[in-house]
């Protein structure tokens, strides 16, 4: 199963090896994880994107690790690949999950539970196979947008316009590649974010997000 490592008395232990935490072990193929403060109170849970099995969402409850994915409306079965969390469409932490052989998920935080609104916001991208994803303020307007890399397909740069995400990606950024991971940050401290795209069997790519959403 997964491992949940904790430091106790200068010793690292796997909390899932403790019997009381073994009720909800994840016995499917995990692909990506993200920590989510779903209530905004400083307490984090762990969203686990699985391949061919239901999503998990682990939290500590009464000193026991419990999977709350069912009660939080997250227990979907898909080809999970990548996941990010942040203030995407609500004033709390939302979740975007990029999937393979199925639609992406965009979970809007609804008072600590989640509602998949990927179809309404046009980010399902059902014909593509998601691999790596990151959040970035593409227009430098103080809100998070979605960068999504698709395996052998067109990469996306989703920006929110009139309550719908529009893909503004253009060549060479959107050109298909055997992508594995996407990260975004101001790597050279010049005030503009970069996007690093990690590919397999071909060169990696590094882009810069300039003014007006230009990625080059």
Per-region residue spans from a language model:
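Blade-edge motifs of beta-propeller repeat domains
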Residues: 3-28, 45-47, 58-78, 94-96, ...
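Beta-rich catalytic cores
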Residues: 29, 53, 79-81, 102, ...
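Beta-propeller blade termini
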Residues: 30-40, 80-93, 130-140, 144, ...
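Residue-level detection of beta-strand scaffold positions
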Residues: 34-36, 48-50, 57-60, 97-98, ...
């Amino acid at each position: 199963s997964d491992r949940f490592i904790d430091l106790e008395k200068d010793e690292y232990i796997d909390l899932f090896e403790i019997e009381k935490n073994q009720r909800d072990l994840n016995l499917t193929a995990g692909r990506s994880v993200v920590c989510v403060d779903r209530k905004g109170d400083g307490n984090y849970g762990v969203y686990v994107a699985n391949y061919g099995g239901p999503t998990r969402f682990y939290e500590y409850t009464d000193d026991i690790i419990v999977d709350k994915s069912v009660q939080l409306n997250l227990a979907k079965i898909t080809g999970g690949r990548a996941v990010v969390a942040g203030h995407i469409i609500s004033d709390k932490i939302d979740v975007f999950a990029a999937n393979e052989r199925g639609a992406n998920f965009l979970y809007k935080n609804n008072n600590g539970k989640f509602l998949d609104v990927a179809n309404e916001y046009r980010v399902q991208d059902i014909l593509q196979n998601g691999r790596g994803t990151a959040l970035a303020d593409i227009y430098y307007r103080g809100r998070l947008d979605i960068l999504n890399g698709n395996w052998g397909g067109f990469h996306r740069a989703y920006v929110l316009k009139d309550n719908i995400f529009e893909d503004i990606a253009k060549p060479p950024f959107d050109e298909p590649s055997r992508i594995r991971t996407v990260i975004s940050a101001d790597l050279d401290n010049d005030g503009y974010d970069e996007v690093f795209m990690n590919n397999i069997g071909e060169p990696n790519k590094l882009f810069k997000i300039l003014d007006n959403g230009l990625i080059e």
